A protein has these predicted regions:
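Signal for well-folded cores of large energy- and translation-related assemblies
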Residues: 26, 48, 89-92
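Short, amphipathic alpha-helical "recognition" segments used to contact nucleic acids or chromatin
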Residues: 36-52
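Key DNA-contacting residues within the recognition helix of helix-turn-helix
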Residues: 69-72, 85
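A generic structural signal for short beta-strands and their flanking turns/coil linkers
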Residues: 39, 64, 75, 91-95
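DNA major-groove recognition helix of helix-turn-helix/homeodomain DNA-binding modules
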Residues: 81-98
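N-terminal flexible/basic segments that precede or flank functional cores
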Residues: 1-41, 105-116
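Short alpha-helical DNA-recognition segment
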Residues: 51-70
Length: 116
């Protein structure tokens, strides 16, 4: 008889999360963390779309090659949102900031909308 491995033997349940994994994990500044991740993703996507090396991307964005490497690994701890926005602009991307009043009067959120 075949022995079940531990994964097969356990009942696994899933819970639907929100659109923000950082909020689901209970982290402080979850909106800011998600915005940083989205900005980093946009930088990495544009670098790949252009077929740039890390050195070429560094020259274009004004960042260092090691900065580009860190962003490629989604390590955002050394980067302000302003610095990432500037890198995107230097890559030829428009960065728009839109402010809306919440209908329910609750605290606002911070979101990054990327082109599809």
């Amino acid at each position: 008889m075949r022995q079940k491995n531990k994964r097969e033997a356990e009942d696994v349940t899933f819970e639907l999360g929100s659109e923000n994994v950082f909020a689901d994990l209970g982290l402080e500044n979850a909106d800011g963390l998600l915005a940083n991740a989205d900005l980093t993703h946009a930088i990495n996507t544009e670098i790949r779309a252009r077929g740039m090396t890390q050195v070429e991307a560094a020259e274009r964005t004004g960042l260092t090659q090691s900065d580009i490497s860190r962003l490629g690994k989604m390590k955002t701890d050394r980067f302000s949102q302003e610095r990432m926005q500037n890198a995107l602009r230097r890559l030829g991307m428009d960065v728009e900031i839109r402010i809306n009043r919440r209908a329910d009067g609750g605290p606002g959120t911070l979101k990054v909308f990327q082109p599809k």
